[in-house]
Amino acid sequence: MTQEQATRYPLVLVPGLLGFVRLVIYPYWFGIVKALRRGGATVIPVMVSAVNSSEVRGEQLIDRIREILRDTGAEKVNLIGHSQGALTIRYVAAKHPEMVASVTSVAGPNHGSELADFLEKNFPMHTLRGMLLNGLIRLLASIMAVLDTGYRGTRLPTDVDASHHSLTTAGVELFNSQYPQGLPKTWGGQGEELVNGVRYYSWSGTLQPGLSDKGRNRIDGTNVTCRIFARTFTKERGQCDGMVGRFSSHLGTVIGDNYPLDHFDIVNQSLGLVGKGVDPVKLFVEHAARLKAAGL
């Protein structure tokens, strides 16, 4: 074991919508946790409500961080959030900056998701289509909760409406008005890296024909799903990962926003079946070294 990724503070990994720690033997952060631990990092994947508002998830995460600080003796944590997990960790850092050394958004909808806007418009919650979609998401969340062998805490609440609104452009705009730390002042720009003693970083990917749809993604159904979802985008058409737009993902120092990775690839899903051009696990390993070099 090397110490190249041995950060000063623990790395706490927070999943997105319908996230989990480990489904039976299948981890959300496929290959990522092992790679970071091989480099000497203390890595703790956590669970919050799979389907709920970013604020509710954030309050759950605050409680979990307090446990981690108590158990490890650390003064702070480095938070890394994928998708809605990015909004969740931003909430925590805004509320309790004294507990957080850094916030890293990985494909986070920091200005909302055009996919969520499309679903809100075409599947209103009080229509039959909306209720069917709501029921399907509830069912998936329930099944995944039963199968998640990586979490053994109390049953976490589910609120599909709150979760959906938290991901729309309007919902995130309201969120950003309350928790603006690290946001760019101009569309497509970079935000301040250091706010209230917390360092902010982000990276994301885009669908790139000839790269993101090649390699092992040719047998990964999630890539097809992302390509279908990408058709719902207008403002960032051709500049998204299927669920989150390139510029919408920006937060703090933007490490990269155009990796040839779809929304699942960026956390090495599914089963490490990703396209050509970049190794998503390497991005996490390099970032841990970056945090270590910054004294975090």
Q: Can you say where each PLM-predicted feature lies in the sequence?
A:
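Active-site catalytic motif of lipid deacylating hydrolases and related acyltransferases
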Residues: 3-77, 125, 131-133
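Short boundary motifs at domain starts and secondary-structure transition points
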Residues: 1-5, 191-192
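Glycine-rich, phosphate-binding/catalytic loops in enzymes
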Residues: 28-31, 96-98, 119-123, 219, ...
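Short, solvent-exposed loop/turn segments at secondary-structure junctions
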Residues: 17-19, 50-51, 109-111, 205-210, ...
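Short aromatic-enriched loop/helix-cap "lid" or pocket-rim segments at secondary-structure transitions
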Residues: 24-26, 114-119, 211-216
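C-terminal catalytic-base region of ester-bond hydrolases, centering on the histidine
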Residues: 187-296
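A conserved mid-domain beta-alpha-beta active-site/ligand-binding segment of alpha/beta enzyme cores
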Residues: 151-207, 216
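Serine-dependent carboxylesterase/thioesterase catalytic core
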Residues: 15, 43, 59-173
